[in-house]
Amino acid sequence: MKKITGLLLAMIFLFVFSGCSTENDLISDFDAVGDMEISSLDETPTHVEMPTKIQTPSETETSSNNETPIYVEMPSKIETYVETELNDYHNVVQAQSSTPDVPTTFEPIIDNNFSGGNGTQTNPYLITTPEHLIYLSSKINSGKMNNGAYFALGADIDMAGVEFTPIGNGDHRFSSNFDGRGFTISNLSPKLLYDDYGNNANYSCGFFGIVGNAEIKNLCLENVNITYTYDSNYFTEIGILAGCVYPTRECKITDCIVNGNINVSTDVLLVGGIIGDIFANDDVKLEFARIQSNTKLQVRGDSLEVGAISGSLLADGEESFSDIFAQSEILHNSMYYSHVGAFGGVSNRKGNVNVSNCFIKINTNKKHGDEINALIGGMIETYQPNGRFNFTNVFAFADSCTKLYDIPSENPVKEENCGFTDVLPSTCNFNTEIWDITDPASPFIKFNF
């Protein structure tokens, strides 16, 4: 019996060490991907063989530094894997929030770190300097500012040369009210930081990091520049206005001007000219209205969701997008696939997506494996497609494609007066009290700032 036991132990010993060799090979494979540099967006990325096993983020979180990581088998298709992980990622973000995005009682208090105000609707905290914005970011991100406060700009602010961390993160979303009052924040360069899968980190980058139950209005962002390169297998959400919009009840963003550039490179990217990732769970209501943007997005990675409005849209609630003019130059280079459109990748399991009176113009490139459509780049197939889409007076154009969307037949789609065009037709039916369409190729929104 001892001989048999010894033989079994020897076999196990050999098996374990042979497995360790495989794990070392795995690490080498990941290093090969991480070390790969793409010198030009016009170059085809060098193909790197995917490892047969990959460590999942959820398992990384639960294992200590002294434990051997657990590995799971790699799905046969990288796109299916990425889409599955996108769903898991949203669940992780929701679970990790240490301060639930629910109403809290805000107690008005004078804070001399602002120019004035006590944080109420009638007397908001007044922001007039870069230092005020930095202070606001630190208060929100550390959880030292209760949800429901009111903030307002009192002057134009030049952020050139100022180090700035996005407002709102995975632990503490921005769930308050921000009124730009028509003032402009210019030359902003938000930085993006990583920790363990977003723990206490700003993995969502923009002027705002993660936005929760909030209202943002009358804000102008000019010459925002986000440059970022990171070798990781984490999801990264980047948008000029906000990296991620992730409320539990309601979020409203209206009357905003967004202009800037994004130049980023990492594994899996959700990048939007306005918002990187929009996640609307059950019973959530989202409203985006009267927004004008002009952006340039240069994106490199393994798998990409890129949009002139939003890189990714998960729509399980009631989502409304109206009177939006989004222009974007999108240069993308992915190793596996890209979804590119006004909304890059969309999932609509049971939501109601309403898009009306919108004009989108996209100048982009296309390579083998990319899915490009002017309005909805591609559907995220993991989710069961039984949500509703309503498109009214929507006109969009993108290079390298000929249609607005390619939505599965299971999704009810109601389309009225829409078209694939880079010039607004005379029959666009846009409200001229909101739009100036003197030049139908370059209309603009009449803001009441």
Regions from the language model: what does each represent?
Residues K2-A10:
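Sec-dependent signal peptide recognition
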Residues S21-E23:
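Bacterial signal peptide processing site
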Residues V102-F449:
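Surface-exposed repetitive/solenoidal architectures
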Residues V16-G19:
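C-terminal motif of bacterial Sec signal peptides marking the signal peptidase cleavage site
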Residues S28-I109, G117:
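Ser/Thr/Gly/Pro-rich low-complexity, disordered linker/stalk segments of secreted
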Residues M11-F13, H132:
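Alpha-helix capping/helix-boundary segments
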Residues K3-I4, D25, I54, N66-E67, ...:
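N-terminal cationic leader/targeting segments used for protein routing and processing
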